[in-house]
Amino acid sequence: MSRIGKQPVPVPSGVDVTINGQNLSVKGPKGTLTLDVAEPISVSRAEDGAIVVTRPDDERRSRSLHGLSRTLIANLVTGVTEGYTQKMEIFGVGYRVQLKGQNLEFALGYSHPVLIEAPEGITFAVESPTKFSVSGIDKQKVGQISAVIRRLRRPDPYKGKGVRYEGEQIRRKVGKTGK
């Protein structure tokens, strides 16, 4: 039995869960999220209101989807109650970010500013010209947008310049030695 998959997902008060076959809908104070659960996995409610994820057999595919489905459901519940935030920072001379309406405009050493538009359900916040955050209720969407932004100017291994996640340690390389 999957150690993660066998644990029930607790549903806090104020969160409404609707199970319709393989489709799961979670509605909370921050919004609504839906998930299509993969075929061999079944989802049901326990007496105490928690969500229970079960698998029909011990095939490799069922075992791998068991823990995944449970974690995705737990992420939905956390998303509609607390939400997700990814803090990011920019290092480099002249590198900065500013909020333009709901979008982010970056100056990252290119000959032009780079504009990142906020997709539906994602909000940006700028704390300083070098620190900003990406927030939303969908963990996958927050992570994807954060990765797209980081890819604009990856951290340089020699000088450490670029966009990185807050607290991320960049592995530095030693430059060429002069004679």
Swiss-Prot record:
Gene giving rise to this polypeptide: rplF
PROSITE patterns from the UniProt entry: RIBOSOMAL_L6_1 (PS00525)
Family, per entry: Belongs to the universal ribosomal protein uL6 family.
GO CC, any one term: cytosolic large ribosomal subunit
Assembly with partners or alone: Part of the 50S ribosomal subunit.
Entry keyword set: Ribonucleoprotein, Ribosomal protein, RNA-binding, rRNA-binding
GO biological process: cytoplasmic translation
Molecular function terms, GO-annotated: rRNA binding; structural constituent of ribosome
The protein's name: Large ribosomal subunit protein uL6
Superkingdom of origin: Bacteria
SUPFAM superfamilies assigned to the protein according to its UniProt record, in alphabetical order: Ribosomal protein L6
Chain's role: This protein binds to the 23S rRNA, and is important in its secondary structure. It is located near the subunit interface in the base of the L7/L12 stalk, and near the tRNA binding site of the peptidyltransferase center.
Matching PANTHER family: 60S/50S RIBOSOMAL PROTEIN L6/L9, LARGE RIBOSOMAL SUBUNIT PROTEIN UL6M
Pfam families the record matches: Ribosomal_L6 (PF00347)
